[in-house]
Amino acid sequence: MKTTIDMQVLYVTCTVLAALILGYIQAMIIYRLWFHPLSKYPGPWLARISNLYSAYYAWSGDLHIDMWRCHQKYGDFVRYAPNRLLVNTNTGLKAIYGFNKHVQKSTTYNVMVHRAPSSLTMTDPQESAQRRRIVGQGFSSTAINQYESIIMEHVQRLATQLVRRGSDRGSGWSAAQNMSDWGNHFSFDVISDIVFGARHETIGKPDNRYVLGCIDGANIRTSVLFQAAELTFGRVDRYLFPKSIESRNRFTPFVSSLVRTRLQSHDASRNDAFSLLVRAKDPETSEGLSMDAIGGECTTLVMAGSDITSTVIASTLFYLSTHTESYDRVKSELQQAFPTADDVRLGHRLNSCRYLRACIEESLRLSPPVGGAPWRRVVSDGLLVDGQSIPAGCDVGTSVYALHHNSAYFKAPFVFRPSRWLTDSGAQGRESRDIRLAQSAFAPFSIGPRSCLGKGMAYAELTLVLATLLSKYDMRAAEGPMRGIGGGRVGAPWGRHRENEFQLTGHVTSAKTGPYVEFKKS
């Protein structure tokens, strides 16, 4: 008898709880669809009620593509999550990421913090400004010039490896090379050397290449949590992403060992970034960085610094190998600037290679390494964007990929056209206006007080390696089945179908493959 009563009580209790939960979910859906402050903005219906919509596309690596698709369907303002709004205008870019006291980094950046926050993840504007004053000293013009010899050493090592194995045709051309892989190895070697003075030599040795896979693997989980931090409740993410956590647990000790080794060397005279961070003081407060803070900054530098450069190396070579006219113009420009490839160095002659720089800019526009929307939280009195009042407490952002392909700012937005960044002598005023308009919507390194600190070093590294390789070798796209790898595919989902567009899979950093190209000594 007692057992029967207990079962009845349990049944009633479960029924009531289920009804309450169901009622709560229904009320939440009704509120988010019709009464939420962002309810007037269009967007996918699932995105309007749940963060899981954007989390899914983050997991798939298609987040930037879907954001672009949504703008094509719904317009410049898209509700991309219950409490998040996408804005696809140049004025929105400036309002959200410029010097504006009404916004700060979203708390979703907390999912990226491990032990100590870095200049990338800090949400408080004052704390971030102080950290950037210190860390920025490691990326000043003076510091970059000190890193040049390190970069060039790895450039020469890469150049040697690219032609080490010839093709089967015996024509003087190398075997087809996957430039995503080579770019990853080169960029990781450079940033490890610059930050820690560590020589991993993944260009020539496979021993430490596993670290690159760990970075990509760990970032799958991070990219999902950046969209749906609630998946950390009850440690649900541990069950959803066991391989990502395994990758993180391999990568974190690797970086920690680099920090320990560098500290134990007791060599404060080195000019690597680690030494500069140890010595650097905030010019306003004279405060330095703790070891945990330095470790956090170094981890960010290794992950972000290697990814951006490797992605742009691959994308630029993809576009040049498929656009003969642009390739020939770059070759001619470099031949005029440098008698031999050994003469390539930072300075006036490299700066004069305007078409090379335009090719890099156009590759960054078409295939930005970070194509999603870095979310910002609206604070205080709200934010006014293009006449739209966005209330405090909401997240707002601009998809870099979507903005870079907005025809309001870029004519023929999916066409590789480096000349769009150049003003020829005697150009008319309209051409100059077109360039200014394009520049107003160009943000591969973001803009404003939270823009990328390593932008100057990235451009230095990119111009040095691309100028050297294109001066030293002739290059062509691989023939046969490897031709076109890296581009879109006819019949693929909308946004992935363009064969002439270098495709990226976005998981905080960018996974990619190709292009396959062949080299021959000039």
From Swiss-Prot:
Instruction: Check the record and name the InterPro entries matching this protein.
Output: Cyt_P450, Cyt_P450_CS, Cyt_P450_E_grp-I, Cyt_P450_sf, Cytochrome_P450_monoxygenase
**Gene Ontology CC: one annotated term:** membrane
- CDD domains from the xrefs? CYP67-like
User: Known SUPFAM superfamilies for this protein?
Assistant: Cytochrome P450
The record, for PROSITE patterns, names: CYTOCHROME_P450 (PS00086)
Q: How does it sit in the membrane?
A: Single-pass membrane protein
Report the EC number(s), separated by commas if there are several.
1.-.-.-
Q: What is its main location?
A: membrane
Where is this chain's protein located in or outside the cell?
A: Membrane
Recorded hits in Gene3D superfamilies, A to Z, give: Cytochrome P450
In UniProt terms, what function does this protein have? Cytochrome P450 monooxygenase; part of the gene clusters that mediate the biosynthesis of the host-selective toxins (HSTs) AK-toxins responsible for Japanese pear black spot disease by the Japanese pear pathotype. AK-toxins are esters of 9,10-epoxy 8-hydroxy 9-methyldecatrienoic acid (EDA). On cellular level, AK-toxins affect plasma membrane of susceptible cells and cause a sudden increase in loss of K(+) after a few minutes of toxin treatment.
Any extra remark in the record?
Gene clusters encoding host-selective toxins (HSTs) are localized on conditionally dispensable chromosomes (CDCs), also called supernumerary chromosomes, where they are present in multiple copies. The CDCs are not essential for saprophytic growth but controls host-selective pathogenicity.
- Name the UniProt record assigns to this protein: Cytochrome P450 monooxygenase AKT7
